[in-house]
A protein has these predicted regions:
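Glycine-rich, basic loop-to-helix element that forms the pyrophosphate-binding segment
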Residues: 70-87, 108, 164
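Conserved donor NDP-sugar-binding/catalytic core segment of glycosyltransferases
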Residues: 100-135, 214
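A conserved acidic beta->alpha catalytic loop
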Residues: 45-54, 73, 96-102
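Short, acidic, metal-binding catalytic loop of nucleotide-sugar glycosyltransferases
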Residues: 28-38
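Short aromatic/hydrophobic "clamp" motif used to bind/position activated sugar donors
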Residues: 92
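Cell-envelope/extracellular polymer assembly enzymes that use nucleotide-activated donors
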Residues: 8-11, 40, 191
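Membrane-embedded multi-pass helical conduit in multi-pass membrane proteins
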Residues: 254-327
Length: 327
């Protein structure tokens, strides 16, 4: 396909591991982007227990726009840095094996980068579940009560934000701050955007940029993800204490208050009965989750709606426990 040299070249970059379920669809949607300039895709492949590496090689053999590089550690920031190093263009658009670009996404991020002069431009994560549990997760991830008030989750007006989903970067802005910090195996996007903003650059949220994301679809996988995310958020806050906010402290406070309430209540069973009032703390929290989850899920199908309170509780408690353990 011929390209228009008046348009800047774009390198889409991503890192994958155990993504055989989504990789082909993700890559095909990226390559189907209607962008007039040169477009390449660089995929860093980590050690996988499924057919991810074979599928990536097949895609590279079929499509000359696809380049595959190794990510021996399998860790996300290492893979992203390896893909960026192999990319040939100065506009870098991040992709993800669980995410799907809508038509025109690349052209729009290039336009917004040029119009705003920002170092990074991104939009909303639009989670879509493939089963009842994942649909409940998708709802929780879009709810201020579920995951907090970040614009890329819940929406908002265009303008500077602390972080955005995925993002489209100017290479010079990433190189100026040293790329992704490979210490942060989770939360590396937020941490990178923090350093970009600290360097005097702008991270721009554009609500019209919406990327579909497939969330975890089992309780175990979702709880594990939230536990590790909470732990790594604490590590980010330890390195960047100025980033501390009540939104990040709320889940660990809920965990602490609930555990303390249960312990005090159990002491009351054997000593002073009035201490049993401590049990009211976790009970009030669970009642609140049930009520809010039920009303927030009014637009879900019945199986997903029934699961939403559980998903919200797992999200809060797993995230908070991970934060406290500093996983």
């Amino acid at each position: 396909m011929s390209t228009d040299p008046s348009y800047p070249g774009v390198s889409v970059f991503m890192t994958v591991r155990n993504e055989e379920r989504h990789l082909r669809t993700c890559v095909r949607q990226i390559l189907a982007q209607e962008y007039a300039g040169d477009l390449e895709l660089v995929v860093a492949v980590g050690p996988s227990t499924d057919a991810t590496a074979r599928i990536a090689r097949e895609l590279a053999a079929e499509r000359p726009q696809v380049t595959v590089v190794d990510n021996p550690s399998g860790l996300t920031p290492n893979g992203l840095n390896a893909a960026i190093a192999a990319a040939k263009h100065d506009l870098l658009v991040r992709a993800d094996g669980h995410a799907l670009f809508p038509p025109g996404y690349v052209a729009e991020v290039v336009r917004v980068l040029d119009a705003t002069g920002a170092a990074n431009v991104g939009g909303r994560m639009v989670p879509e579940g493939t089963n009842a549990f994942a649909r409940a997760v998708a709802k929780a991830m879009s709810s201020p009560f579920g995951i907090g008030g970040a614009a890329f989750h819940t929406g908002g007006g265009a303008g500077p934000q602390p972080t955005v989903y995925l993002g489209a970067f100017r290479r010079d802005a990433i190189e100026k701050v040293g790329g992704y910090d490979e210490y942060f195996t989770r939360a590396q996007d937020w941490e990178l955007n923090h350093r970009i903003r600290e360097s005097g650059e702008v991270v721009w949220f554009e609500p019209g940029l919406a990327v579909v994301y497939h969330p975890r679809d089992t309780l175990k996988a979702f709880a594990r993800q939230q536990f590790h995310t909470g732990g790594w958020r604490r590590k980010v806050m330890s390195k960047h204490p100025e980033s501390v906010s009540l939104r990040y402290l709320a889940p660990p406070l809920v965990v602490l208050a609930s555990v303390l309430g249960v312990l005090v209540g159990l002491v009351g069973v054997f000593t002073w009965p009035w201490l049993m009032l401590g049990l009211a703390v976790p009970l009030v929290y669970l009642l609140g989750v049930l009520v809010i989850g039920w009303f927030e899920g009014c637009d879900l199908d019945p199986p997903a709606r029934r699961r939403l309170p559980l998903v919200m509780a797992v999200m809060h408690l797993s995230w908070g426990a991970g934060f406290l353990r500093n996983a």
